[in-house]
């Protein structure tokens, strides 16, 4: 249309198109440098790529040619620190100024009591689930999946693994979304009901499941708690801790697992249940029909009805164990202002960040 406005014409209506453009993956690249974007990105944002020291950090500098309002920061450095103990030490030593998503919730109280830091607690789009391989011979029977759901005490997991940070969920949808329906009562903690369902399925005290866990603390800690809860109803688990590369290869790609725990942080990603080849292998034509209707629907009220029906369907089918919505727990130097409290998409946006005097 002009130098700063484009017109996009779609071949079919797509009610989610505008939302998709807000994803972190939806970026604008210079066609002349797009092929080298993986190692030397050249985009349109308020920062320019400066340096990538693999395994250590990525450095950005201010883009003085930015089309929008000028930013306050001259540069920013993103360091890679995955170990919770190292994260705590880095903040205390002043080696880093902020952890937008801090990996050690057990030490947040210490930062809250320290005037040199701000603890920033908000919401994410991360549905944390006990992902279930629906094609596993041990888990094909809905009564077994339902028994697992009733064996799980969500609040105990939130308290024990996340130190109280998180909101229990009963389906794959963010509680802060206006179309969310609370279905937690449908799979409430009821060990006796769980035992009865296992008996009906003919697997009482004879079921052993693999539980493969990726690195995040919510998975490792949550996995131990869930294993204990399942043991109380007669289900044994074989826990295997994996690094991300192993998890992606064995679980996500290879589908070689019974249970795993992961937080799905993409916004409005309930559509993954429409893909029977996705790693939990849920195959429902009824659900696919709902997603087809959703993609073509542009009326918000009609989309809301479809989304609520979709939430109910996957809860009724006990596709996965729905645990909690991941909280965004951040820690920052008290003089640093403007960091996101909530995480509506997968991004660390520093556009509005500055240092106070």
Q: Each predicted region: which residue ranges?
A:
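A local structural motif
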Residues: 8, 68-79, 95, 204-211, ...
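Periplasmic-binding protein-like
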Residues: 120-132, 176, 284-290
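Detector for C-terminal structural segments
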Residues: 53, 151-179, 218-227, 245-357
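Gly/Pro-rich hinge or "lid" segments in bacterial periplasmic/extracellular proteins
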Residues: 19-71, 75, 83-85, 192, ...
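Surface-exposed binding/hinge segments that line
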Residues: 1-29
């Amino acid at each position: 249309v002009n130098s700063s406005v484009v017109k996009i014409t779609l071949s079919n209506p797509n009610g989610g198109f505008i939302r998709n453009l807000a994803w972190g993956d939806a970026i604008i690249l210079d066609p002349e440098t797009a092929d080298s974007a993986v190692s030397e990105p050249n985009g349109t944002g308020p920062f320019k790529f400066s340096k990538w020291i693999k395994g250590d950090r990525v450095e950005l500098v201010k883009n003085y040619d930015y089309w929008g309002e000028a930013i306050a920061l001259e540069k920013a450095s993103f360091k890679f620190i995955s170990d919770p103990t190292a994260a705590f030490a880095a903040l205390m030593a002043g080696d880093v100024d902020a952890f937008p998503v801090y990996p050690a919730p057990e030490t947040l109280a210490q930062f809250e009591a320290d005037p040199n830091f701000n603890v920033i607690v908000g919401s994410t789009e991360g549905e944390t689930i006990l992902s279930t391989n629906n094609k596993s011979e041990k888990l094909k029977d809905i009564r077994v999946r339902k028994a697992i759901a009733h064996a799980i005490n969500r609040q105990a997991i939130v308290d024990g693994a996340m130190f109280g940070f998180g909101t229990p969920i009963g389906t794959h949808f963010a509680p802060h979304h206006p179309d969310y329906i609370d279905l937690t009562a449908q799979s409430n903690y009821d060990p006796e009901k769980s035992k009865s369902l296992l008996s009906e399925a003919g697997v009482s005290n004879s079921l052993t499941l693999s539980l493969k866990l990726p690195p995040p603390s919510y998975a490792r800690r949550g996995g131990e708690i869930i294993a204990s809860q399942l043991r109380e109803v007669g289900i044994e688990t074989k826990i295997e801790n994996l690094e991300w590369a192993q998890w992606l290869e064995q679980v996500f790609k290879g589908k070689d697992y019974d249970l795993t725990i992961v937080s799905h942080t993409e916004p409005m990603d309930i559509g993954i249940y429409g893909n029977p080849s996705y790693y939990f292998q849920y195959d429902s034509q009824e659900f696919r029909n709902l997603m087809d209707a959703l993609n073509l629907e542009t009326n918000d009220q009609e989309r809301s009805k479809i989304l609520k029906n979709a939430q109910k369907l996957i809860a009724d089918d006990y596709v996965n164990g729905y645990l909690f919505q991941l909280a965004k727990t951040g820690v920052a130097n008290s003089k640093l202002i403007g960091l996101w409290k909530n995480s509506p998409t997968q991004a660390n946006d520093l556009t509005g960040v500055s240092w106070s005097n």
